[in-house]
UniProtKB/Swiss-Prot annotation:
Protein name: Na+/H+-antiporter, MnhD subunit
Keyword Plastid appears in the UniProt entry: no
Function per UniProt: Mnh complex is a Na(+)/H(+) antiporter involved in Na(+) excretion.
Annotated membrane topology: Multi-pass membrane protein
Domain of life: Bacteria
Organism: Staphylococcus haemolyticus (strain JCSC1435)
GO molecular function, one term: antiporter activity
Cited NCBIfam families: PRK07691.1
InterPro entries: CPA3_Na-H_Antiporter_D, NADH_UbQ_OxRdtase, ND/Mrp_TM
TM ranges: 5-25, 33-53, 72-92, 109-129, 131-151, 169-189, 207-227, 241-261, 277-297, 303-323, 327-347, 373-393, 410-430, 457-477
Positions of disulphide bridges: none
Subcellular location as annotated: Cell membrane
Length: 499
């Protein structure tokens, strides 16, 4: 019982941290320390939870002692536990990086509160067993993201916030409509219970279920930045400071991917012929359009932003396969991309601190004065491209294996070719930004640059360690994958598991 209550504690600690931050006024230094302390405590709880899940299996919490499917359920399985640990590590890195890059004017107000509360929404989305509460937690982290996007009040931020707000209002509306239709069919909001009931109703309510599927895919693909709903992403992610871009790019899109994977495996497992072809089609177009964007620009921000799309597409190819290799690959690649995108956005943030520009046309020759920064970026670039034995390799290997097992050879080839596009785009930054004649900046060894560089190096080291630990983590990831290609495991954990 104590172990199960720790699941809720991973939500309670950041909530109380956010409440404390409200009462600190404009004392930005105190806010930094309180935020980092709260995040470290949350990480400790999350690591304990991950260990407990690995040893004892999924942990279930029934709020108010109301049993499933009647009460509010939180379920922590291997995948959600890994995602939560990764998310907290990233949040700690971004908070530390923000102290020298976000600007004191932002930190004085609701910057740290918004980061902490956004983490609450993300953790809640990863653990809820209720489809309506998934909507609630989506709204929690979206409201925080609105604040983070607009803080600073620059013209581009205000313009992109309006677009971002409109997109999310529309998708949230369709989310509620989808939940309402689903509830009218099955009479329950518990995701495991919905899955059980749909297994007997899919033949009699096929038309309505197709509408629900389309609505869910529209909502979650928009959140994930998948084709064709990605149009908001390049502009909205370009506007805020680098720390916030890293936060959004690493975490927000992955919540959308998680929601697709969870609902597809539970609600539409019996309609794979339609649903998985739809997701595969969107995934491949996401890779293609992301690849075009990644090689079309000389702007460091835009190159990495479009690489987010490529990664989302690759993950969704694995999800669409819905077999063991595909899901294992999707899980590996999701965690890899969360870590490596954080590292890359922080690294180009350091480059911006030095050069005051994101355009590769405005600077070059950074390797002469910043060799550590340059070679750290090179390692992160190789990891992003999936060069073995770095972290990007393992996820793509399993995803390509899954496509060939299912006979989707063209899909596998597109995933492989995307690695070349990714490698070209990031090596383009490396060669043009770090080599050539130094121009457009005055070399500086300021404390701020050194601090930001150190945090970026730590992020890359964590990414490398994840890649080198792939074999060690395989049993945990394999266990996490089982509940998706065999949804009866998740259903049993919720409706018949221990509490």
């Amino acid at each position: 019982m104590i172990e199960n209550n720790l699941v809720v504690l991973s939500l309670v600690v950041p909530i109380f941290t956010a409440i404390i931050l409200v009462f600190l006024g404009q004392r930005y230094r105190a806010k930094r320390y309180v935020t980092l302390t709260g995040l470290v405590l949350t990480l400790i709880v999350a690591i304990i939870n991950l260990r407990n899940v690995y040893v004892d299996g999924p942990l279930k919490v029934e709020l108010g002692s109301w049993p499933a499917p009647y009460g509010i359920i939180f379920l922590l399985d291997s995948f959600s536990a890994m995602l939560i640990v990764t998310s907290i590590i990233i949040t700690i890195l971004i908070t530390a990086f923000s102290s020298t890059t976000a600007g004191i004017d932002r930190e004085r107000y609701y910057y740290h509160f918004s980061i902490t509360f956004m983490l609450v929404g993300i953790i809640g989305a990863f653990t809820t067993g209720d489809i309506f509460n998934l909507f609630v937690f989506f709204e929690v982290f979206l409201m925080s993201s609105y604040a983070l996007l607009v803080l600073g009040g620059t013209q581009i931020q205000l313009r992109e916030t309006v677009k971002y707000l409109l997109v999310n209002i529309v998708t949230s509306t369709f989310f509620v409509i989808a939940v309402a239709i689903l509830y009218s069919i099955v009479g329950t909001l518990n995701m495991a219970d919905i899955s059980e009931k749909l297994s007997t109703l899919s033949n009699t309510h096929g038309g309505l279920l197709s509408i629900v599927f389309i609505l869910f895919i529209f909502v979650f693909a928009t959140k994930a930045g998948a084709f064709p709903m990605y149009v908001w992403l390049p502009g909205s992610y370009y506007a805020p400071p680098f720390a916030i871009i890293a936060f959004f790019g690493a975490l927000l899109t992955k919540v959308g991917v998680y929601a697709i994977l969870r609902t597809l495996s539970l609600f539409f497992h019996n309609t794979m012929s339609f649903s998985h072809y739809t997701i595969l089609f969107l995934a491949l177009l996401t890779i293609i359009f992301g690849s075009v964007g990644a090689i079309a620009y000389d702007d460091t921000k835009k190159i990495i932003i479009y690489n987010i799309m490529i990664a989302v597409g690759v993950i969704l190819v694995g999800v669409a396969m819905m077999n063991e290799a595909g899901i294992i690959g999707a899980i590996y690649y999701t965690i890899h991309d969360m870590l490596v995108k954080t590292a890359l956005f922080l690294l180009i943030g350091v480059m911006y601190q030095i050069t005051k520009s994101t355009s590769l046309k405005d600077f070059g020759g950074l390797i002469k004065h910043y060799p550590v920064l340059g070679w750290t970026f090179f390692i992160a670039a190789l990891s992003l491209a999936g060069i073995p034995p770095l972290s990007g390799f393992y996820g793509k290997y399993y995803i390509v294996q899954a496509t060939f097992e299912k006979g989707f050879y063209v899909s596998g080839i597109i995933v492989l070719l995307s690695s070349l596009v990714v490698l070209y785009s990031v090596i383009h930054i490396f060669l043009k930004g770090f080599f050539g004649k130094p121009k457009g900046y005055e070399p500086t060894q300021s404390v701020n640059v050194k601090h930001a560089t150190t945090i970026s190096i730590i992020a890359v080291v964590i990414t490398v360690v994840f890649g080198l630990s792939a074999d060690l983590l395989y049993p945990l990831i394999s266990e996490a994958a089982q509940s998706f290609y065999d949804p009866s495991i998740y259903i049993e954990s919720v409706l018949g598991g221990r509490s």
